[in-house]
Regions:
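A glycine/threonine-rich phosphate-anchoring loop and its flanking beta-alpha core
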Residues: 99-192
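Short glycine/serine/threonine-rich phosphate/pyrophosphate-binding segments
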Residues: 92-99, 120, 237-238
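C-terminal charged capping/lid subdomain of soluble metabolic enzymes
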Residues: 169-171, 270-360
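Residue-level signal for inorganic ion chemistry
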Residues: 63, 114, 152, 258, ...
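Active-site segments that bind and position negatively charged phosphate/pyrophosphate groups
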Residues: 184, 188-301
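Alpha-helix C-terminal capping segments
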Residues: 96-107, 242-243, 263
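Glycine-rich beta-strand-to-loop/alpha-helix junction loops that act as flexible
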Residues: 57-58, 88-90, 231-232
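ATP/NTP phosphate-donor binding region
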Residues: 1-84
């Protein structure tokens, strides 16, 4: 299945998708139920005569109980399989709405309208949906493609700086794993990205979506190459889970996880120090964290425990996405030096309050 992605900047002052676009969705589908992040203006959807479910946002809210509010509402309204769910918000909202659409009456249509950089460049594209479990992030979910994705870059005008920076972590990822030219463009244009220059943002979003679409087209269900989109995520998910969901934004944890994957790759001699420096430099330019704070509860045992239930584990073997060779190349593999991984974890937790080294 192919998903159409629309990227544009709507009229100034519009804080959500335009009334005409909302109404067009109403005309195309039988019913529309809009699920929005708490605090987002839903005025324009009144024109489409939609029903609305307001959900709390944040990784700590990405649970089965919260997601079921969508199912409950649809059942209360007596909506049939012609219903269309619309996700208006960030990545957490999109993941939950997509999952609800995947399981409601065994599958209904849904539309993504992402309002954060993170959702625009990553989570709204590709059909991954789901919720977190106390033992692991995104452990309950389904692959379910949206009918289309509307990206209104004007919604980013009110996005907090921290959320903007978090989303840029995923933009950086594309350059590292497969698009060296894009990485070099980011090095030159990071200041404009942080300044929310409209043309720069649109280009970054477009290039990111193109990269992800190419990978998903080749491997929709993550049997192989799609896993490379998870650079930094195995370490990052451990940080999110071990620190408590909501302490870190997803992109912040991924940024640290990417630096950890970089560190480990360098330890094994897979990349040179010149590339390591460029990665640290671009994270710094994006104002993203590259290490755990002193008061972090993370320790080596927590890292290994959470990583052991990562979705990329196969037959008991942890598999990681690591950098190898020149910029733009990576490897999804379980064939790595485990001591290098343990040494990397030890280095990153050494000064944390949790501390505790991995046994050699």
């Amino acid at each position: 299945m192919y998903t159409r992605i629309f990227i544009r900047r709507y009229a100034p002052g519009c804080n959500s998708i335009s009334p005409s676009s909302a109404v067009s969705c109403r005309r195309r589908f039988h019913n529309v139920i809009v699920d929005v992040a708490l605090g987002i203006d839903v005025y324009h959807f009144m024109f489409a005569k939609t029903d609305t479910v307001v959900l709390p946002d944040g990784e700590e809210e990405k649970t089965m109980d919260v997601m079921m509010k969508i199912i409950d509402k649809a059942l209360e309204l007596g909506l049939d399989r012609k219903v269309t769910f619309v996700a208006l918000g960030g990545g957490v909202i999109g993941d939950m709405v997509g999952f609800a659409a995947a399981i409601y009456q065994r599958g209904v249509n849904f539309i993504q309208i992402p309002t954060t950089v993170m959702a625009m460049v990553d989570s709204s594209v590709g059909g991954k949906t789901g919720v977190n479990h106390p033992l692991g992030k995104n452990m309950v979910g389904a692959f379910h493609q949206p009918q289309c994705v509307f990206i209104d870059t004007n919604t980013l005008s009110t996005l907090p700086d921290r959320e903007l920076q978090s989303g840029i972590a995923e933009v950086i990822k594309y350059g590292l794993i497969r698009d060296a030219d894009f990485f070099e463009w980011q090095e030159k244009n990071m200041a404009n990205l942080l300044a929310r220059d409209s043309a720069t943002l649109r280009y970054a979003i477009k290039r990111s979506c193109e990269n992800k679409a190419e990978v998903v087209k080749a491997d929709e269900k993550e049997a192989g190459v799609r896993a490379t989109l998870n650079l930094g995520h195995t370490f990052g998910h451990a940080i999110e889970n071990g620190s408590g969901y909501g302490v870190w934004l997803h992109g912040e944890a991924v940024a640290i996880g990417t630096v950890m994957a970089t560190n480990m790759s360098a330890r094994m001699g897979w990349i040179d120090q010149g590339l390591v420096k460029r990665i640290y430099d671009i994270m710094d330019a994006a104002k993203l964290p590259v290490e755990l704070p002193l008061d972090s509860p993370m320790n080596a045992e927590t890292f290994l425990k959470v990583m052991s239930v990562d979705k990329k584990v196969a037959n008991g073997q942890l598999r990681l996405i690591l950098l190898k060779g020149k910029l733009g190349n990576c490897l999804f593999t379980g064939d790595f030096d485990e001591q290098a991984m343990k040494d990397t974890i030890d280095e990153f937790v050494a000064e944390c309050s949790g501390a505790g080294k991995v046994a050699a």
